[in-house]
């Protein structure tokens, strides 16, 4: 099973923001659900994962701001003790998952971790050798976590792709069809070994209709200067968004929400018929701008 914690630059001071999103998705909670319905779903998830401690479920419910006093009365403890118990409840939940089957936990953009989630991740790493769990944490070089020196932690530095691997990525995107040498050279020179830039730039060139597609290769229709190669990855992505026409508002709204957004949230934000919204999201997924995880209405979308 895969668990994903997606950190956000807009929530660096929101305690346990990635964990809350994970729990909501895992339990299938929707904003239109009543508190009672959401608690029922949380209870069902706890039972499925073998969590029979009511205090643990109560702490998770409190973390999700689900409070029905008759079901889970508030705990009479200090705020610091409550925080400690909440972190332990989350760890217990993850350990129960790992007991059922091996778990891979991915923490994206850890340089945006809020302090409480950083505490949670540090505790998980401290005990990870006891459970069947692989923890993958991606972050920028300037982030210096305390656990980087732990003996059971391996650090990998992801450098720019060498030219040969960059060319292989271009070939994979063109599905084996050969680009004109001058076009491939322009892509590799501009992208400078950045995988996302290589991918987006190659896709942009293929979509621009400046080449004729043959059985095994592409032929440039005009001079190389007509090739659409923006000066930056940001400009390139904005150009691709502009091609979406009127529906680009959906992508722009999703980007304002963060690196990740749910179908439930985008539906409540964008004024558009449900069928039209679903069709637009399908087009965005097909274009490669976003990835979809899960099925609507529980779907979550991630930007590259």
For the regions a protein language model found, what residue spans apply to each?
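Phosphate-binding active sites in nucleotide-utilizing proteins
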Residues: 1-29, 102, 111-116, 128, ...
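Conserved RecA-like P-loop NTPase ATPase core
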Residues: 5, 19, 60, 86, ...
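A short beta-strand-to-loop transition that corresponds to the Sensor-1 phosphate-sensing loop
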Residues: 6-9, 137-142, 160, 201-205
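Conserved Walker-type P-loop NTP-binding/catalytic site
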Residues: 12-104, 132, 148-151, 156, ...
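Short secondary-structure boundary elements
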Residues: 19-22, 135, 157, 165-304
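Catalytic acidic motif of RecA-like/P-loop NTPases
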Residues: 95, 108-114, 119, 125-126
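The start of beta-strands in P-loop NTPase/AAA+ ATPase cores
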Residues: 101-104, 109, 300
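Sensor-1/coupling segment of RecA-like P-loop NTPase cores
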Residues: 120-157
């Amino acid at each position: 099973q895969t668990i994903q914690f997606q950190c956000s630059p807009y929530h660096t001071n929101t305690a346990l923001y990635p964990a809350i999103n994970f729990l909501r998705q895992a339990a299938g909670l929707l904003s239109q659900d009543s508190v009672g319905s959401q608690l029922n779903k949380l209870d069902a998830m706890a039972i499925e994962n073998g969590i029979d401690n009511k205090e643990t479920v109560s702490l998770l419910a409190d973390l999700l701001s689900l409070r029905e006093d008759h079901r889970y009365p508030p705990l009479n403890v200090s705020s610091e003790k409550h925080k400690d118990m909440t972190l332990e409840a989350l760890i217990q939940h993850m350990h129960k998952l790992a007991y059922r089957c091996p778990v891979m936990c991915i923490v994206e953009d850890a340089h945006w971790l809020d302090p409480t989630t950083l505490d949670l991740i540090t505790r998980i790493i401290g005990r990870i050798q006891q459970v069947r769990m692989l923890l993958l944490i991606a972050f920028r070089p300037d982030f210096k976590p305390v656990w980087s020196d732990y003996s059971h932690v391996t650090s990998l530095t992801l450098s720019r792709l060498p030219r040969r691997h960059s060319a292989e990525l271009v070939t994979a995107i063109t599905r084996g069809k050969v680009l004109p040498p001058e076009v491939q050279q322009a892509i590799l020179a501009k992208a400078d070994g950045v995988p996302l830039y290589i991918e987006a730039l190659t896709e942009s060139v293929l979509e621009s209709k400046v080449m004729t597609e043959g059985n095994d290769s592409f032929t440039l229709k005009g001079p190389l200067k007509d090739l659409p190669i923006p000066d930056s990855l940001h400009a390139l992505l904005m150009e691709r968004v502009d091609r979406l026409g009127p529906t680009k508002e959906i992508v722009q709204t999703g980007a304002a929400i963060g690196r990740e957004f749910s179908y439930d949230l985008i539906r409540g934000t964008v004024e558009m018929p449900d069928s039209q919204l679903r069709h637009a999201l399908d087009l965005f997924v097909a274009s490669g701008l976003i990835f979809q995880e899960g099925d609507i209405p529980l779907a979550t979308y991630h930007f590259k």
